Amino acid sequence: MDHDAILEKVISVVNDTLEVPADVELTEETAFKDLGADSFDLLELVTALEDEFDLTFDDEALEKIATVGDAVSAIEAAQ
């Protein structure tokens, strides 16, 4: 799966999981904390991403996921 396809799926999962308002446009630079996500929300998001992409993030990758782009990079590295 190429970068743009992964990005599109990540944005979809983020929108669904964090219930992002329709008027908010997500980019690779969007930080989850700026969307009001707390640690529970991030855990829920990571679980949803792992399910969507059928993978498991290692602890090191989890510590680095703070933005949409970070999530895309972690998925690319895990595939």
Model-inferred region functions:
Residues M1-D23, A78:
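Thiotemplate assembly-line natural product biosynthesis machinery
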Residues K9, L45-A48, A74:
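Generic alpha-helical secondary-structure signal
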Residues A31, T67-G69:
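Short, structural beta-strand-to-alpha-helix junction motif
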Residues S39:
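Catalytic nucleophile serine of serine hydrolases
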Residues L43-K64:
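Phosphopantetheinylated carrier protein domains
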